Swiss-Prot record:
PANTHER family: GLUTAMINASE. This is Glutaminase. HAMAP family: Glutaminase. Keywords: Hydrolase. It catalyses: L-glutamine + H2O = L-glutamate + NH4(+). It comes from the Bacteria. Homotetramer. Its EC number is 3.5.1.2. It is an enzyme of class 3 (hydrolase). It comes from Clavibacter michiganensis subsp. michiganensis (strain NCPPB 382). One of its GO terms (molecular function) is glutaminase activity.
């Protein structure tokens, strides 16, 4: 799908105007492997053959192919947006509460920064639980309403929570509860552990599609202004900080390899989605449920690299190199 009239649109404003996304998607059809996440039943039941891609450009045009309208829970792809909302609602003080350094640990490691008791960065579970707790609201209900409204502003449309997913995330998220209690014991988390996990679980359960997620990425890529609505969602500084941490930490302990190969700030998720934000260029989302050992979509990573190569999106120029042993 391409917005009407985009073929004649100025390529400087619409870098994807001549890109054949159907061809790009088909080129990755044989890039299989990986396993669908089974941490909750709703993810385990996902059709592994689903695949979609969507782009949103600074002038608000949407390009999409494949299963770009398929709805799924946003899962960890919500983390850069939670960080942005926390930064906005605390006037930047969230940077004192959570680190911004990469970690070689697993995304759900029961570990905090030595000496500070802070989560290492907002892209791991501990960091996202903490940033969700920093979003404005004196009660859990107020906080979760603010999170949903904020995510909807990033998307440019009203979003909904999959209540079944939210319930499963809370009931089966023992490690997240452990992280929250650890942060409480360190004096880092200032709401109850149960409320912190509940806010994060509901954020992960928000329903999106590749097209919606691409619009959210585009809002960060456009300096905090939603290109579909024209509304400012967060400041340029907040958008910059969120995208910066996506670049260094968004694919967990594979972030260095990702930036070498793809060169675009991104956040992976166990739903099989990857959201990308290429500053000043576009927002994108790729979706394919089977994951590698680090929880990143196998086919999605291939699509992201080919997209970056074709549009020259690599932050450091050129195209991504082959993976080396």
């Amino acid at each position: 799908m391409t917005a009407p009239g985009s073929a004649s649109h100025d390529a400087a404003h619409d870098p994807a105007h001549a890109l054949d996304l159907d061809r790009l998607l088909a080129s990755a059809a044989d890039d299989g492997g990986g396993q669908v996440d089974d941490s909750i039943p709703q993810l385990a039941e996902t059709d592994p053959s689903l695949a979609g891609i969507a782009l949103v450009t600074p002038d608000g045009r949407t390009h999409a192919a494949g299963d770009s309208a398929h709805a799924f829970s946003i899962q960890s792809a919500v983390k850069p947006f939670l960080f942005a909302l926390a930064l906005a609602d605390t006037d930047g003080a969230a940077l004192d509460a959570v680190g911004i350094e990469p970690t070689g640990e697993a995304f759900d490691a029961i570990k905090l920064e030595s000496g500070t008791g802070r989560p290492p960065n907002p892209m791991v579970n501990a960091g996202a639980i903490l940033t969700a707790s920093l979003v404005r609201g004196s009660t859990l209900e107020e906080r979760t309403a603010r999170i949903l409204a904020g995510l909807s502003a990033f998307a440019g449309r009203d979003l909904e929570v999959d209540e079944d997913v939210a319930e499963c995330e809370q009931l089966l998220g023992d490690r997240n509860h452990a992280l929250a209690h650890l942060m409480r014991s360190e004096g880092t988390l200032h709401v109850s552990a149960d409320d912190a996990v509940a806010a994060y679980a509901r954020a992960c359960a928000v329903l999106v599609t590749p097209e919606i997620l691409a619009a959210m990425g585009a809002t960060l890529a456009c300096g905090g202004r939603n290109p579909l609505t024209g509304s400012r969602v967060v400041s340029r500084e907040v958008a910059r900080d969120s995208v910066s941490v996506m670049a260094t930490c968004g694919v967990y302990d594979g972030s260095g390899r990702w930036m070498r190969r793809v060169g675009v700030p991104a956040k992976s998720s166990v739903s099989g989605a990857i959201v990308l934000a290429s500053p000043g260029r576009l927002g994108a989302a790729v979706f394919s449920p089977p994951l590698d050992d680090q929880g990143t979509s196998v086919r999605g990573a291939v699509l992201a690299q080919r997209l970056a190569d074709e549009l020259g999106l690599h932050a450091f120029g050129g195209t991504g190199g082959r993976e080396r042993a």
